[in-house]
Swiss-Prot record:
CC cofactor note: Binds 1 Mg(2+) ion per subunit.
Catalytic activity: 1-(5-phospho-beta-D-ribosyl)-5'-AMP + H2O = 1-(5-phospho-beta-D-ribosyl)-5-[(5-phospho-beta-D-ribosylamino)methylideneamino]imidazole-4-carboxamide
Keyword Cytoplasm: yes
Gene of this entry: hisI
Protein name per its UniProtKB record: Phosphoribosyl-AMP cyclohydrolase
Binding site residues for Mg(2+): 74, 76, 78
GO biological process, alphabetically ordered: L-histidine biosynthetic process
Enzyme Commission numbers on file: 3.5.4.19
Location of this chain's protein in the cell: Cytoplasm
Subunit structure: Homodimer.
GO terms for MF: magnesium ion binding; phosphoribosyl-AMP cyclohydrolase activity; zinc ion binding
Essential cofactor(s): Mg(2+); Zn(2+)
Length: 120
């Protein structure tokens, strides 16, 4: 890596996934150094689950993968941006993006799959 990344005390960084074509923000997750390395090696987004305390590939269960077109780093090196080609929905709730609701609770995104059919 030619840019120094400023991982936090848990050795994680926030990672935003953005659709490379539309510019839509798809999700926010966290990455470890290993997740970044795996993403670069495979060309597919990998993250670190804070609740399960493990590395995971986006779409590993659902098939809704994120093929990485570019990885960008913010000015402080403490967050990264995955520019991706999203296959299927990005959100585990079935929506195209995890940002599918307003603060008032209005649904503004599109549900593109039924999570009960995917995550049995």
């Amino acid at each position: 890596m030619s840019v120094d990344l400023a991982f936090d005390e848990q050795e994680l960084l926030p990672a935003v996934a953005q659709d490379a074509e539309s510019g839509d923000v798809l999700m926010l997750a966290y990455v470890s150094e290993e997740a970044v390395a795996r993403s670069r090696e495979t060309g597919y987004a990998h993250y670190y689950s804070r609740s399960r305390e493990e590395l995971w590939k986006k779409g590993g269960s659902s098939g809704h993968t994120q093929e990485i077109e570019e990885i960008r780093v913010d000015c402080d090196g403490d967050a990264i941006l995955y520019l991706v080609e999203q296959a299927g929905g990005a959100c585990h709730t079935g929506y195209d993006t995890c940002f599918h609701r307003t603060l008032d609770g209005d649904i503004v995104g599109e549900q593109v799959f039924d999570p009960e059919e995917i995550y049995e």
